[in-house]
Amino acid sequence: MGEEGDFSRQHLLNPTLFALLGPLEGKEILDAGCGYGYLARMLARRGARVTAVEPAESFFGYAAERERTERLGIRYVQADLSTFRDYAVTFDVVIASMVLMDIPDYLPAMQNCTDALRSGGSFIFSLAHPCFEGTEREYHDKGYVEVKEYLAEYCLPQPFGCLFHRPLSHYLNAVIQRGCAIQEIVEPKLDPASASAAPGHERNVHVPSFIVIRAAKLP
């Protein structure tokens, strides 16, 4: 994965996230589930004050080491999003990018994310689109994505563990029930020129792999 993420992050997720974020200078931002820290570093380089939480020791170790070699002022915390609440500040923005569908106990994690926001702050999260979880290979072979058992919750085995399929309504209702108002939903689309230069990503011209939601914490 490159300094600004893999192809999907560079061409689909990052442009969407930064469009939803707007100006970053001076904002307090929590990167919830930061992985190896690429997004936290991008945010800090644009002037945000960043706290980044990651449970996995290998990812956390890499991100913390990068902070020692490139001082951006990022505060890294190794902790579980479902249980950690000890933040020193309230945040203008909490971002959980490609995280919640990897967490078995996702509702406490969403609660902790929204609790960490100041009134009026933004909760932005991205997911593997639960409506269209077919692989690139399936789309290439069939020309469509087949949807099965959409309304159930289950584990989709991955090399890293489970991707937990949940209906989209479960996430949206969880945000609303935690005192937030949904402001914008984006299904990132790949332009044909980028797709032609990156074989294996053609489906994103027609069928979104991701969905990004921005919500605001109500007073």
Predicted regions and their residues:
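A short SAM/SAH-binding and catalytic strip from SAM-dependent methyltransferases
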Residues: V93-L107
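Short alpha-helix
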Residues: G161-I185
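A short acidic, Gly/Pro-enriched loop at the edge of an enzyme's catalytic core
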Residues: F84-V94
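Conserved class I S-adenosyl-L-methionine
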Residues: M1-E25, Y38, M42, Y62, F123-E153
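Core SAM-dependent methyltransferase catalytic element
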Residues: R178-C180, A198-P219
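A short glycine-rich, Lys/Arg-flanked "PGG" loop and its adjoining helix->strand segment in the class I
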Residues: L107-S122
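Class I SAM-dependent methyltransferase SAM/SAH-binding core
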Residues: L30-A32, Y36-T83
